[in-house]
Structure formats: structure tokens, C-alpha cells
Amino acid sequence: MGNSEIFLDSARVPEHMQEKIKDALRFLEYQNGYKILFAYESGSRAWNFHSPDSDYDVRFVYVRDKDNYLSVSPARDVCESFKGIAKGTAYEDDLLDIVGWDLSKALHLMRKSNPQLIEWLNGPLPYYIADPAFNQHLLSISRRVTRMEPIYMHYRGMATGNFREYLQGDEVRYKKYLYVIRPLLAAQYVYENMSIPPVDFKQLREVTDDSQTDEFRESLNRLLKYKTEAQESATMPKDPVLNAWIEARLAQKVDFKEGPGPTSEQVTKLLDSTFNVALSKWGN
């Protein structure tokens, strides 16, 4: 990783944490011998409803030396061991949750319209971008190959599962409401626009405002205020207004119709070309 001139909103990511995260990413590069292509914040700080003690959910994609891809026993395609690697070093921090995917895995999941990867690429808080032109290329091809129905079903499934698991009691955690409301609004946006929804929750609310009653807006504004001031574990009494809105949205059935996308052969050609460009540039 070279020096990055990216500076983020310090209200969401304080400057000292920005530097610590960039240093931690350089440390991972050195320890693992790969090249990080990009790194983004992916959690509540990216969604813009973080608590004072929220984690920093850093997600990155990397590429290895090309020889690693020629072996019948390739290296692991995921880096999930940051806490273990950093233990006892200057980079150890309980608030840092850092996970990376090999570019080959990322492109394979892009073919499957993986919502996590799509959110990373569209995230508002990049910690590092190795090559802005290549990053823009990744974003461009993701928009060409991503199918909206899997994205829609992902958000609907997330909302349904979180509602059943977390919002059935009389006392619930603030953030669990948002883990249902955000994906419901994201699913609405996908259905209405056939495109990727904004990652920032404030922007998402604005572009889906027609589905929100005044009473719901008041309850949601109150929830957001408490959520951003309270600790992650803080709870609240169940809100009947929020629950009624959620239940009504979950009960809605839609007929999702999406036009034809690129053929499997076209997608393969795009992804293979992208992978080869990265190997030529960073695969030594």
C-alpha cells in the first residue's frame, strides 16, 4: 500500500482511527505478501447510524503474486485472522474488524450478484484505493453483471430474518430495528429503480420517502437519535409504530420482473479480463 490521500468524514471515522486502519492494512500486506486493491468501511459507520462504541468494519480485496494462482493447492482466498495476526502488536484493537477477500473470490461472487461486495464497492467511506481507474472499472463491471433480483431477495430475506429473531420481545436493541428497516428500504429502492440502493441510510431514506408516514418518520428520527447517542447494547421498549410499518412492508408481495442481462459467456469474458489486468499490474 502506498500513501493514500483519502480523508473521510471524521464524524464517522476519527482521523486517528483512519491512520490506524491504514497502518493495519499495510501491516496485513507485509505479513501476507499480497497487494490490497481497495478497502472500505462496511458497517454501521458506512450506513451512517453508528453508536459511539461501534466497531470499524473494514473490508478489502487483495491480489497475490500470479504464481499463487498456478498451484493445484492455492492459498486461502479469505483473510479473516486480523485479530490473531495483530495480537500483541501496535495494531491490536478490539474495535477493528478487518476482513479481506482475494480478487478471484470477489469476482466469482460478483458473478453471483453478491450484495456484500456490491455494498463495499458503492460504499461512501473508502480507506484505501490502489488505483482509482481500476476501482472505477470494478464498479462499472459490477453494474453490468449484477442482477437485481438476487439483491432484492437478499434484502427482503435479511429484513424477515432479523424481524423474527430480534423484534419479537417487549424490549429490543435500538440497532436491531435498523437492521430490519434499512434492508426493507433497500429492497424497495431496488424494486422501484432496478439499481443498487444508496449505502448511506440518510440518503436511502430520502429516496424512499414516499413509503413513510409522518408517524413513522417521527418514530424513526427518535430511534436514530437514541441509536447514535447510546451504546451498541442499549435497548428500548418495542415501538408499535415501527413494528406496524415493518409488518405491513413484510406482508407486501411483489412480482419482480427484470430484463435480460449479459450472457454467461459475456460475464466470464469481462471477469477474466479484469482478473488478468490486475495480475499484470500487481501480480509481479
Feature map (PLM): residue ranges:
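Acidic, carboxylate-rich catalytic segments that either coordinate divalent cations
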Residues: 259-284
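Catalytic metal-binding acidic patch
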Residues: 43-96
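Conserved nucleotidyltransferase catalytic core and NTase-mimicking acidic/glycine-rich helix/loop elements
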Residues: 133-264
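A basic- and aromatic-enriched beta-loop-alpha substructure that forms the phosphate/nucleotide-
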Residues: 73-157
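Short loop/turn segments at secondary-structure transitions that flank enzyme active sites
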Residues: 62-67, 109-116, 161, 186-187
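Glycine- and acidic
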Residues: 2-11, 166-168, 255-260, 284
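Helical scaffold of the NTase/Pol beta-like nucleotidyltransferase catalytic core
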Residues: 1-40
